[in-house]
Amino acid sequence: MKNSIISYPRIGANRELKFAIEKYFKNQSSKEELLKSAKDLRIRHWQEIQKAGIDFIPSNDFSLYDNVLDAAVLFNIVHTKYKNLNLDALDEYFAQSRGYQGENGDVTALAMKKWFNTNYHYLVPECDNADIIALTGDKIFKEYLEAKELGIESKPVLIGIFTLFKLIAFKDEKTQKLAKEKLLNAYIELFDKLNELKVTWLELDEPYLVYDLSKEDIALFEEFYQELLNHKKDLKILLQSYFGDLRDIYPKLLESKFDALGLDFIEGKQSLALVQQYGFAKDKILFGGLINGKNIYANDYAKSLKLIKELQKYTQNIILNTSCSLLHVPYSTEFESKLDSSYLKLFAFAKEKLQELKDLKEILNSSEENPLFRANQELFKNIPERLDEKVKARLKALKKEDFTRTPSFKERALIQKEFLKLPLLPTTTIGSFPQSADVRSNRLAFKQEKISAQNYTEFNQQKIKECIQIQEEIGLDVLVHGEFERNDMVEYFGENLKGFLFTQNGWVQSYGTRCVKPPVIWGDVSRTKPITLAWSKFAQSLSQKIVKGMLTGPVTILNWSFPREDISLKESTEQIALAIRDEVLDLENAGIKIIQIDEAALREKLPLRKSDWHSEYLDWAIPAFNLVHSGVKAKTQIHTHMCYSEFSDILKEIDAMDADVISFEASRSNLSLLDTLKAIRFKTEVGPGVYDIHSPRVPSVEELSLTIEKILNKLPKEQIWINPDCGLKTRAYEEVITSLKNLVTATQKIREQL
């Protein structure tokens, strides 16, 4: 029995990659220094994986920003607007990631989307000229040879042709048609080069196969691979899937020329049933994904061994594998000195998952009962308490009316118009303002008990004063307090709710250099005291204008945390919803007129198969949001915000959230959402996001005016809010102030024309 992993986290044990890239962005280091830091990290990771006894060690899973972009660049799928900048390869790569504004031109970044049902974001490759598609990059070969120099025969990992093709945004059908042919030739050339290098295994990741596949999808997949696999020669090909099962294509794969199939037995609800029904091919190896690549709880070896035993009825050719890339979990528990060992022993981050694979291999390769198995089973005895009877009783007492807000949206809109007295096209921001180094050091000093609570509060109050003053000077209509007390929109609430645990160093890559530290939902969740009330009251006391209360919604808190596995996601979310509901009512009682409840991650856990959308997610996720705000008065305006996602197909469900105003992150997707909003007569007021805050570009008044006009061409003016597309925490103040001034100027200009 051998073992494997799909991919390893690339940010480093202490986010070394993030800091190295940011240094380069700030012109504080050279290209050579950045590339050396990246190479050092790769070497460290390979040696770590090798030391852990992993047989199939991945290469080309490393990325300076995003692995989808890496695949696109490898095959020269680069939009002309980036080519025309005439930058060197590295800066052209980063121009696609972040946009570019300088002497060579002014271009926006590629659109960003959620990577399937995870909190990782990938960049959407754009193709306007298929003629140039060819194997022009060498990253995959270089990194294979780097590993080879260390004595490691690695397994290069690359996004498969079918998934890559499905993720590309093509200019038109003609471009797409030509791209199909050119991309196939480029992959064939890739196979030839890997054969020249005498590479043994190539892993092609095809996660798109876990969606509902149409007949056309299956035909396209077969068209690609029937040709491609004829060119594999001595190269062995592993078709790797994750985030679900292969029910639409599994029987066909058994008859294909792939040398191995990677199946996900964690999220693939039907993976085992498919093997039981159709068996497994004698000429193939099964890479069995049984170590959870998405959650941080320790593997129960008894369950894994039971699964392997069942699979061995159908094939003896099994490689132990992770369910998906380990990119989605933190690096290692060895950096967690503050978490009680009674909890920590039950966690396995990326490095610990390597150990689990090593243990399982050893247990399966030994004849008598192994002490490693006994030690693992001991972990699950004497688990710390998770239950809270008060929370259970409160959930049990919920009635149907607790999930419905009255009066109707139409009636509320009239009441709020009279009560709030806002101008046409009201301007606002999404919530957070830039967090400078002094804000972060003040928070750290307070956490480390180096300053008093009073000093900490006074510092933040001063920051709030400055933030309110800046917004008033700019001329925004609805203000925010800036969120200087918050490290992260989910972690902050988790820290103030009972039932959560926190890591010191549990960083996970969200996109590019952005890393998040998800909390762990350990037990039943409740609110023991107000969380944001004092900050919101203080901010509102500083201005005659409305200052929004800012909260994170229950579905986002759940989706951006590591969830419990002992109760349903529905129950966990309802517990969080009741806690946030208490906060909403406190804010309203304190005179806060607009309360924003962000559901940035609503789309995130939507099942990948449409048939499961309602029964497994939306039927409880939407009511959980309703539970949070159903108790407020008609005059209180409820806002929500949603991040990078595709919403077109769930807009009716979003409307059913019954918020009064919804802001979307739509600027990177060229506001394509507007047509759908118009088509379904979306009733909620909307702020589609008029510029992209994930890029350092400052939009001009002209650019913003055109965007606002574009929105007005699609939606009634009474329905529109003007705002950036996300919070401003990661930007610099000079960018923010100029951008917001331009936003207000553009809005005033448009108002005069209406």
From Swiss-Prot:
Keywords: Amino-acid biosynthesis, Metal-binding, Methionine biosynthesis, Methyltransferase, Repeat, Transferase, Zinc. Catalyzes the transfer of a methyl group from 5-methyltetrahydrofolate to homocysteine resulting in methionine formation. The lineage of its organism: Bacteria, Pseudomonadati, Campylobacterota, Epsilonproteobacteria, Campylobacterales. Its EC number is 2.1.1.14. Zn(2+) binds at residues 641, 643, 665, 726. It catalyses: 5-methyltetrahydropteroyltri-L-glutamate + L-homocysteine = tetrahydropteroyltri-L-glutamate + L-methionine. This is 5-methyltetrahydropteroyltriglutamate--homocysteine methyltransferase. The active site is at residue 694. Belongs to the vitamin-B12 independent methionine synthase family. L-homocysteine binds at residues 430-432, 483, 598. Its cofactor is Zn(2+). The gene is metE. GO terms for molecular function: 5-methyltetrahydropteroyltriglutamate-homocysteine S-methyltransferase activity; zinc ion binding. L-methionine binds at residues 430-432, 483, 598. 5-methyltetrahydropteroyltri-L-glutamate binds at residues 15-18, 114, 514-515, 560, 604. The keyword Methyltransferase applies.
